[in-house]
Amino acid sequence: MYPDYPYFAVAITRTCGSGGGSYIGKQLAKAFDIDLYDRKLLRLASEDSGISEELFARADENTRKTMLYRVSERVYDGSIIPPESGNFISDENLFNYQAKVLRELLNEESYICVGRAADFVLRDKPNVLTVYVDAPYDWRVEREMKRQGIGSSQAKHYIDKLLSLIHISEPTR
């Protein structure tokens, strides 16, 4: 631990079905007795901004991976669009509020964050551990089948669709 940084964060990125968030993230949070932020971050960003949590959730669903990673490549610089602007509820500004909350939380508590481009948002912080969780494709398909109660072809379609949103394709199987 760095003496100037009493808190730490673990930023988990993962492939769909790997268990990175639903299992590993939860286990780490439990072991360290700290909060796990995933969709919970939307509520905090809503409280911070005064923007409806539903708008954050809608933007999150609409932009899922592509927007988060496109915006996050510039890394949050502290700028937030003011309420009087027509772009106040733009996807970029909603992302900026989430990034702002992630950075501010690091001054208040240790936490685990799953997704939310936290690895990019917090990459300049020395007290952040970034973890990437992956698993074999067939294992992830099995996991999604059980988690969602769906068949193999549906699980494959679901995983492949999410991967296509971030322009990643599975190696030839």
Locate each region found by the language model.
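Extreme N-terminal, non-catalytic leader segments
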Residues: M1-Y7
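Residue-level preference for the first positions of well-ordered beta-strands
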Residues: Y7-A11, S110-I112
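Glycine-rich phosphate-binding P-loop
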Residues: I12-K26
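Short beta-strand-centered segment that lines the nucleotide-binding/catalytic pocket of NTP-utilizing
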Residues: D35-S46
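ATP-dependent small-molecule kinase phosphotransfer cores
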Residues: S46-S110
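ATP-dependent NMP and nucleoside kinases share a basic, alpha-helical "lid"
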Residues: Y97-Q148
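Glycine-rich phosphate-binding loops of nucleotide-dependent enzymes
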Residues: S152, I159
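Residue-level detector of conserved catalytic or cofactor/ligand-binding positions
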Residues: S164-T172
